[in-house]
């Protein structure tokens, strides 16, 4: 798991340099900013396998029967950078993050992941995130335990066909993209 966290940070830095420019990301500039993430990991920059395993267990226990996803923050540096354990039981809407890259490591389970393409009927979830009804285009990848996934900013991503028996658990890292002259 320690090597997973290091690879996670390196690939996220690479995502910041390779973000795609789309017009979908420009439509949410006047929408209210999302509230701060919840959890008790504020300014928590180190973790270990035992703590991550504990967070996975808590996440699987707190998910409600009608809920598609539950998450527990593991690492955080202020409000801008955070890593969370997510337990996904069923698909959530396809998304685009306009101001951050996202990195996933599949801890357990499997699903299909659609990357790229265009959101159909996009709406603003908040000032930097769009959701849609479906994805037009994009490439489908089957992901399983041990898969590393890099999602640059402005890239559509959508987990579907999630394992119905065990769901899918991922470690998810969000890193805001710097302004072009700050990298």
Show which residues each predicted segment covers.
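Positively charged n-region of N-terminal signal peptides that target proteins for export
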Residues: 1-4
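Short acidic-glycine-tyrosine-enriched beta hairpin
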Residues: 125-153
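A short, N-terminal "cap"/entry segment at the start of jelly-roll beta-barrel domains
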Residues: 19-94, 182-183
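His/acidic/aromatic-lined binding-pocket segments of jelly-roll/cupin-type domains
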Residues: 95, 102-105, 140-141, 148-149
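N-terminal signal peptide c-region/cleavage motif recognized by signal peptidases
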Residues: 12-14
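Ligand-binding loop in jelly-roll beta-barrel domains
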Residues: 142-147, 153-177
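Short, conserved beta-strand element in jelly-roll/cupin
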Residues: 98-113, 117-119, 127-134
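Short histidine-centered beta-strand/loop micro-motifs
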Residues: 92-98, 160-162
């Amino acid at each position: 798991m320690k090597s997973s966290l290091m690879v996670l940070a390196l690939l996220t830095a690479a995502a910041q340099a390779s973000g795609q420019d789309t017009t979908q990301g420009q439509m949410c500039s006047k929408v209210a900013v999302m509230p701060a993430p919840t959890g008790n990991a504020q300014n928590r920059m180190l973790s270990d396998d035992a703590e991550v395993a504990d967070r996975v267990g808590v996440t699987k226990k707190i998910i409600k029967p009608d809920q598609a996803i539950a998450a527990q923050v593991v690492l955080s540096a202020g409000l801008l950078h955070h890593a969370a354990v997510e337990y996904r039981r069923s698909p959530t809407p396809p998304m685009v993050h306009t101001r951050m890259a996202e990195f996933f490591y599949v801890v357990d389970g499997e699903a299909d992941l659609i990357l790229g393409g265009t959101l159909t009927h996009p709406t603003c979830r908040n000032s930097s995130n769009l959701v849609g009804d479906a994805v037009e285009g994009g490439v489908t990848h089957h992901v399983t335990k041990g898969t590393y996934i890099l999602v640059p900013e402005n890239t559509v991503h959508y987990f579907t066909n999630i394992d119905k028996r065990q769901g899918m658990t991922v470690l998810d890292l969000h890193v805001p993209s710097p302004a072009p002259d700050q990298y």
